């Protein structure tokens, strides 16, 4: 496909986004790394990566960033929508404002980025939109109701988008990482740990927190973000990319279990984890 295209990455201040920015830059792409935490992008500048401020929940911020990139480069070949986070806690206990904020970042902000990039890609007659979903977009886990709802929604959104954009030569790809060593788990842990001590779900929360402390927060479980970066590169270079790519720890096991196990069997396994 393209040799040196222009790639725009959201959520590029850490983890998957930052690793992908570094990897694609080394492969010869012109990379724009977008994030709110500009201080976290400074070390990317010596690599030739161009940092820009972006708040995906702010219309003006999106418009300004895309306009600056287009005026400088004259094109945008790839949009990698990676900004997102996980909100974990009992559905009953999570404040609805927090739940709406989850959707604003994980779905509506992503959709707004796409709406601003599409006219550019359509005018080019080509482009790729890569959306970061998760195995959590196919398999729901304990306390993850609002996060999973946002990712399940993203899966359906991306499927419809893919069909709509085919006529314009624009491809849509979903990536479904498993457990990756990023700040994701720390943030989910922090929120869940602040749930009211009088919650009727305290035993459940304690169970999940213990599992998180044992496996995820210690770094014992999870793949290096570079595995995602390599898959994103593969999807960009592919003439006919897959509609979905899965990678990372537990992704194959979790998605296979979802396909072959009855719902109640999977519920039992997830409750015991």
Enumerate the language-model features and the residues they cover.
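Conserved glycine-rich cofactor-binding loop
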Residues: 13-14
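The beta1-alpha1 cofactor-binding region of Rossmann-like NAD(H)/NADP(H)-dependent oxidoreductases
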Residues: 54-64, 96
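A glycine-rich helix->loop->beta "capping" turn
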Residues: 68-81, 87
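Substrate-binding pocket helix/loop in short-chain dehydrogenase/reductase
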Residues: 90-91, 98-100
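Active-site helix of classical SDR
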Residues: 114, 150-153
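Residue(s) in the substrate-gating loop at a strand-loop-helix junction
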Residues: 134
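C-terminal beta-strand-loop-alpha-helix "lid" module of Rossmann-like NAD(P)-dependent dehydrogenases
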Residues: 166-216
């Amino acid at each position: 496909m393209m040799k040196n295209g222009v790639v725009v990455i959201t959520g590029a201040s850490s983890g998957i986004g930052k690793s992908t920015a570094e990897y694609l830059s080394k492969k010869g792409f012109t990379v724009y790394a977008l994030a709110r935490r500009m201080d976290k992008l400074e070390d990317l500048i010596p690599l030739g990566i161009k940092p820009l401020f972006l708040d995906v929940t702010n219309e003006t911020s999106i418009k300004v960033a895309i306009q600056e990139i287009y005026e400088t480069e004259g094109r945008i070949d790839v949009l990698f929508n990676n900004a997102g986070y996980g909100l974990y806690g009992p559905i009953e206990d999570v404040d609805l404002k927090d739940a709406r904020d989850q959707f604003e970042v994980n779905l509506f902000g992503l959709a707004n980025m796409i709406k601003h990039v599409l006219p550019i890609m359509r005018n080019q007659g080509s482009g790729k939109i890569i959306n970061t979903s998760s195995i959590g977009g196919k398999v729901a886990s304990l306390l993850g109701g609002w996060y999973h709802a946002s990712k399940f929604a993203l899966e359906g959104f991306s499927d419809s988008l893919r069909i709509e954009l085919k006529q314009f030569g624009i491809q849509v790809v979903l990536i479904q990482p498993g457990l990756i060593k990023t700040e994701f788990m720390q943030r989910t842990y922090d929120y869940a740990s602040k749930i009211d001590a009088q919650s009727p779900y305290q035993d459940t929360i304690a169970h999940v927190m213990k599992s998180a402390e044992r496996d995820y927060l210690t770094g014992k479980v999870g793949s290096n973000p570079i595995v995602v970066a390599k898959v994103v590169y593969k999807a960009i270079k592919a003439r006919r990319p897959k509609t979905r790519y899965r990678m990372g720890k537990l992704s194959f096991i979790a998605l296979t279990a979802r396909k072959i196990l009855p719902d109640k069997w999977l519920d039992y396994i997830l409750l015991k984890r």
